[in-house]
Amino acid sequence: MAKTKYEVTYIIKPDIDEDSKKALIDRFDKVVTDNGAEELESKDWGKRRFAYEIEKYREGTYHIMTFVAENSEPVDEFGRLSRIDNQILRSMTVKLDK
């Protein structure tokens, strides 16, 4: 089966402390790798100002993950858990060209 490269960008609430943010990022990195993702690259883009308010916040901490997977299981599980977690304001997943 062909492997697909994915890029997941998500925004964390700006008022979360540094230790909690690191734990959140580590937890979601683990969720993705536990569900079959390989070659995980996880980067912090830092705090950025929004063009409009999201849930009464004017800024947020951006984080991006890039990984390869044989199926959509890591993406589906990340999406499910990120919608439940109230520390994540938004997320977006993109399928990248090879």
UniProtKB/Swiss-Prot annotation:
Pfam families (alphabetical): Ribosomal_S6 (PF01250)
Gene Ontology CC terms, in alphabetical order: cytoplasm; ribonucleoprotein complex; ribosome
Matches recorded under InterPro entries: Ribosomal_bS6, Ribosomal_bS6_sf, Ribosomal_S6_plastid/chlpt, Transl_elong_EF1B/ribsomal_bS6
Statement: the UniProt record of this protein carries the keyword Transferase: no
Similarity remark: Belongs to the bacterial ribosomal protein bS6 family.
Organism: Lactobacillus johnsonii (strain CNCM I-12250 / La1 / NCC 533)
Keywords (A to Z) from UniProt: Ribonucleoprotein, Ribosomal protein, RNA-binding, rRNA-binding
GO biological process: translation
Name this protein carries in UniProt: Small ribosomal subunit protein bS6
Domain of life according to the entry: Bacteria
Keyword flag Ribosomal protein: yes
Chain's gene name: rpsF
PANTHER family given in the database record: MITOCHONDRIAL 28S RIBOSOMAL PROTEIN S6 (PTHR21011), SMALL RIBOSOMAL SUBUNIT PROTEIN BS6M (PTHR21011:SF1)
Function noted in UniProt: Binds together with bS18 to 16S ribosomal RNA.
GO molecular function, one term: structural constituent of ribosome
